[in-house]
Amino acid sequence: MLRKNLAAHAIGVLCFSSLVYGAEGDDLPQRAQTVSDVIDKPGVLTPKGQWSFDSSFSYTQNSSNKVSVVGYTVLPTLIIGRIEVSDADRTTLTLGLTARYGVTNATELEVRLPYVYRNDQVSTRPIQDGSSEVVNTTMDGGGLGDVELAVRHQFNFDSAPYWIGGVRVKSNTGRSPYDVTLGDDSTSFSDVSTGSGFWSVEPNITMIHPVDPAVLFAGLSYIYNVEDNVSIGDTDADVDLGDTISLSGGMGFAVNPDLSFSLGLSHKTILKSKVNGSTSDEAKLLQLDTFSFGVNYAYSKRSSVNVSAQAGLTDDSPDFQLTVRVPFNL
């Protein structure tokens, strides 16, 4: 029973962990359907010599409210400049195509091509002027995101827990935030970024422990951003984006051979960034916590539909993210 459950869930949860339903005795091995396919993390690997693909669509909504001083302070109670209240709503749509190839039964290669569309709406009101006028600014655009390459290896097969390690390399093919110029009004940008602007390397390890009919999973990763020289205004600077430490864990549960769901928690700590080797006094650690719920339905032996929702638990986290993925095995 445990083997059948593990074989039927593995393709639906590659991100957080896995369950797999596959008919024993099939001539061709099938890629597992995992709880991680619902949330997009490493999981059961592609069999040797086979290809697997998946298309994905994600919707992310994020909003922020802040009060800023445009000017400087002379004394704690004396402000020179304007006080502005701004409200920003950012919507991001991402279409992704991922291809995986099984080098061996224990090792797979992956490439991911994303297309990113962003719509940013910012409302600003200077409250010190006594004016009720609100300035609305809308910026939108899209393009190729940061292409990613990855390799994963499953270390053991005979006994649980199963351990999968990997390395993911993210390129800077997307439009960098530092390549976006100011518009004619000098208050808004002419376009939006579709990438981070930096290369990064992410080693990661995932633990999967089947407890029939459930699967427990946990993951640890570290994102190292490669320092680069960028143009900030009229000057050049060496920017070292803060690295990211990620922890995740949760549970996948098999309702029947075709349907499973997952619950998960994820925590990310983004370290302080540096410019020209020094850290600004205004820099701070960012803490991102999210709760995830996903459902995986295998409608055929070679394909399934995965729907997941994530809710932000901290101020720095995205408010909401919805992802739909359709894996397909050749």
Question: Where are the predicted features?
Answer:
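Detector for outer-membrane/organellar transmembrane beta-barrel domains
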Residues: G49-S64, S186-V275
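Outer-membrane pore/translocation modules
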Residues: Y117-D234, A283
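Repeated loop/turn-to-beta-strand initiation elements of outer-membrane beta-barrel proteins
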Residues: T107-L109, S159-W163, P213-L216, D258-F261, ...
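Transmembrane beta-strands of outer-membrane beta-barrel pores
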Residues: F57-S63, L113-N119, F155, V169-R175, ...
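Residues on the lipid-exposed face of transmembrane beta-strands in outer-membrane beta-barrel proteins
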Residues: P42, F53, F57, L97-Y101, ...
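Outer membrane beta-barrel transmembrane domains
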Residues: K66, Y72-P76, N229-L330
